[in-house]
């Protein structure tokens, strides 16, 4: 194929591991700190090149302290949790944001982000309960039995800035047994208009935790190591 001249602005990006204190663990995010002037089509190209679960692009805002756009390799998304934590942490480390409450402009609106010396806390829009999925079909698509699900709690869509299907299971062992049937899970999720199921148990791996969860996504890598926006939907559920 003939080569054609292609020029785009230079940019700086950092790889930030969110939800961890140990490098190369947690959930990685690429953060481009000087994204003003980058065309959205180039943002998508950069996201595909970094191949991180999400790539954040920091821009100037006339409504907030910063504006942020998030891209997965497949396209732009309106909001996400771990990129917000990663971006807030990096901007604090670079001295762009000082400790206190910062205002981030997202595609879904302006939200507060609490910048602290030792952590970053995001606020997301409340999620509201919506359509329920058939419990037996959902369990089967995840490689589980209907008896693995928590009795009396529905497999339910929680609709918010980003929406997910909530799937409550009885115990941690059920989470470990998940063996997704991709086509079957896609068939469960497609009518709900979401791409992932958030499966959670009422016990944690560590003694100081109360819940353990897995984000099962048949369209991408299969599983996201930590999904902040889904955790917020679970809290609303």
Model-inferred region functions:
Residues 3-79, 85-237:
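Active-site proximal loop and beta-alpha junction motif in alpha/beta enzyme cores
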